[in-house]
Structures are given as C-alpha cells and as structure tokens.
A protein has these predicted regions:
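C-terminal catalytic subdomain
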Residues: 2-21, 25-113
Length: 113
C-alpha cells in the first residue's frame, strides 16, 4: 500500500551506491547478502564512510540481488529477515517469504551537475 511505504531522506555523496527495493527484497535478504552481489561489480576501495570506486555493471548487481532474493524466498528452513521479525513479535515463522521482488541499483555521479 502506498500509505505504508517507508520513506527516508539521505544526504548523498559522489560515488555513493543506492539500493532500492520492495519488501520482497528486504524481507528475504540481509545487508551482507546484498553486499555479496555488489562487491564483485565494484572496482575501488570502500569503508562504512568512504566509497572511492565505481560499479562496473549496475544491472548485473541488481540481477544478482533479485535472483538471490528469489532463491532465499523459496527456502523453507532459512531464517530470513521477515522470519526473524515475525519471531521477535511472537509469531512462529521460518523460511523465506515468497513475494514480488523489485530491485534498483544506482550509483551517484556528481560530475554531471
């Protein structure tokens, strides 16, 4: 539902990598899983506060993330982010959460300001 969308504001810097997705993505993958798809496409160095390189192929990164999310959504014994949240709320749930999955990967490039 549009009224239930999670909206945030961030101050972006040059070369920041932005991953946007539907609940089908974030209910099934942890940040570490997403990084495993980004890092093979990344040339440069990074830390939690600095990004110095470029993604070689944002489409390949997005495809990897979507595919991994779909794979995890169908695993019945996986402790997904959704399952973890459900269990913390007292609702017994185990496995991924099959859902539609939308992923957008972009990298900020301020040279065209």
């Amino acid at each position: 539902m549009p009224y239930a969308a999670y909206e945030t504001t961030h101050q972006l810097r040059d070369k920041d990598i932005v991953v946007m997705g539907s609940d089908g993505l974030f209910d099934n993958l942890y940040t570490a899983d997403i990084l495993e798809c980004l890092l093979p496409q990344y040339s440069g160095t990074y830390s939690t506060s600095t990004v110095t390189g470029l993604l070689r192929d944002v489409q390949a990164a997005a495809t990897c993330i979507a595919s991994r999310s779909e794979e995890k959504s169908n695993q019945t014994s996986y402790l997904s982010p959704f399952a973890r949240g459900a269990m913390e709320a007292g609702v017994p749930f185990r496995g991924g959460k099959p859902d539609d999955i939308t992923v957008i990967v972009a990298q900020v490039d301020f040279k065209y300001q």
